[in-house]
């Protein structure tokens, strides 16, 4: 027989079990009394009742244990909640106070703004009144100072004008002659511009007359002194050529060694530059020349091997790793010893020699 209570283990369930157990005990006592009165009842019924009572007691014990455990857990949870509440109570209070203050600020924002604006207006009005009072108090002083500065400025301007006028008069007295001369020059330039053609014609006519007279005089002088002038010119030319020859010989004698050294130096420099260029060309073309020579040598060896193969004297057991130069040389020597040819082919011998001897061109 199961427990007639719910699985929740609530306090109401424990009370119901206790009441059922009490009713069961009362019924059992009544039945026991009835059995004793009736002369002994059914024993099996009593056993069932006892089993039901035990099951009810077990259920009650479990419910009580659950109730005790729940009470302990509830007490521990209450302690933890109290500790958390004690720890976070200031923060919660501060946050709630902040929210209240924000709400108050939001509610009174317009009033605060209006109050600030009104205070600023009042302050500006008071400041304006103070400034007006200061202006009213200092206005005569300010007017007097302004008039004084104006008079000083006018006096300074008048003084500067007087000084400038005196300087201009001094400059005028100093440069009056220059100005008059310049004006006269301008007038003369204007007159020259008007009479320029006449002046040019007169100047040209005078120049022509002078040239004609000079030409006549020079012709007369030339006719008179022409033999002497020719003789003197020839004499001067001879003397100049002799002196020039002596100077050139002396210069050649002095600079001959330097010229020879310069020539030798230029030759050496040219050789050095040529050697550098040749070395640069060798360094640039050496790999290509070596590659071309190796290709030509390989081609020559191939042709020699083909020719020997055609003659049937080529070792057919040679492999790609075999020394092809030695094979070709041995085949040529065998042919020469056998007397099949008068002498080894110059082409094959030359090819073998070229391949066997490293190329000395360009230092390869």
Curated annotation (Swiss-Prot):
One of its GO terms (cellular component) is symbiont-containing vacuole. Residues 142-196, 288-313 form a coiled coil. One of its GO terms (molecular function) is actin filament binding. The keyword Nucleotidyltransferase does not apply. It is found in: Secreted. One of its GO terms (biological process) is biological process involved in interaction with host. Disulfide bonds: none annotated. Keywords: Coiled coil, Secreted, Signal. It comes from the Bacteria. Associates with actin filament appendages that are formed in the inclusion appendages of the parasitophorous vacuole during infection of the host erythrocyte. This is Appendage-associated protein. The lineage of its organism: Bacteria, Pseudomonadati, Pseudomonadota, Alphaproteobacteria, Rickettsiales.
